[in-house]
Regions:
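HotDog/MaoC-like acyl-thioester-processing domains
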Residues: 2, 8-42, 136-137, 147-195
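Short Pro/Gly-enriched beta-strand edge/turn motifs at strand-loop
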Residues: 46-55, 60-61, 151-153
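Hydrophobic core residues within well-ordered beta-strands of beta-rich domains
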Residues: 62, 124-126, 140, 164-168
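Short structured motifs
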Residues: 62-68, 126-132, 153-155
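Catalytic strand-loop segment that frames the active site of acyl-thioester-processing enzymes
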Residues: 63-93
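Residues located in well-ordered beta-strands
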Residues: 67, 129-131, 143-145, 171, ...
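Hot-dog-fold acyl-thioester-processing enzymes
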Residues: 85-107, 120
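Hydrophobic beta-strand-centered segment that forms part of the acyl-chain substrate-binding groove
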Residues: 109-148
């Protein structure tokens, strides 16, 4: 059966044809559960749970003292302390450590969404850009305001069955509110039906 013929069948609204697998995939997948999502947000914001999570899943982040300061349906804020655990030989924060905090600010919300739906979400960074504006000293805070855009990308993949790539922005600021670094992370999302 051709794709054109398939589009004329009565079940066209509940099935689409994958361009890579040539097999029917259901479009009526269960959306992200907001109750579970709020619970995941609370868990990641809990200092004890987050420290345990990083110790087990991201030990470098645990050692560096990465912290989740805010996570909701609009934005995510992470921070890292200054000091010997995060510094470079010039006594400022090492650029790769900044990248860790900036990346988590863009990825924490999609990670929570992946745990709030029955389908499997494959997500990974496929590209990044950074601009270093000022020497990073002391506690640096990273803010991403793209949580709604992340949800839209995941829901688009859920609906189409195709991978979706999106750029998310993270801004690093020092304790005086001055920008020290600007980051762009290109995320790739693919929702896979478990059935």
């Amino acid at each position: 059966q051709s794709l054109e013929q398939a589009s004329r069948t009565p079940w066209k609204d509940t099935v689409r044809w994958s361009t890579h697998l040539w097999a029917p995939i259901r479009r009526d997948l269960v959306p992200i559960d907001d109750t579970k999502l709020n619970s995941e947000f609370r868990g990641l914001k809990s200092r004890l749970k987050f420290r345990t999570f990083t110790a087990l899943s991201m030990p470098t982040a645990w050692f560096a003292g990465l912290r989740m300061d805010k996570l909701d349906h609009e934005s995510c804020v992470t921070s890292l302390p200054g000091g010997w655990r995060t510094q470079n030989p010039f006594k400022t924060m090492y650029w790769a450590v900044q990248g860790m905090g900036a990346e988590l600010a863009t990825g924490a919300a999609p990670f929570a969404m992946s745990r709030s739906m029955p389908e499997k979400l494959r997500m990974f960074v496929v590209g990044t850009e950074a601009k270093f504006v000022k020497r990073a000293k002391g506690r640096i805070t990273f803010t991403c305001n793209d949580v709604a855009a992340a949800r839209e990308a995941i829901e688009e993949s859920m609906e189409t069955g195709e991978a979706v790539e999106k750029d998310f922005f993270s801004i690093g600021k020092d304790s005086s509110g001055e920008v020290v670094s600007e980051w762009v992370f290109k995320w790739n999302f693919l929702v896979i039906d478990r059935t």
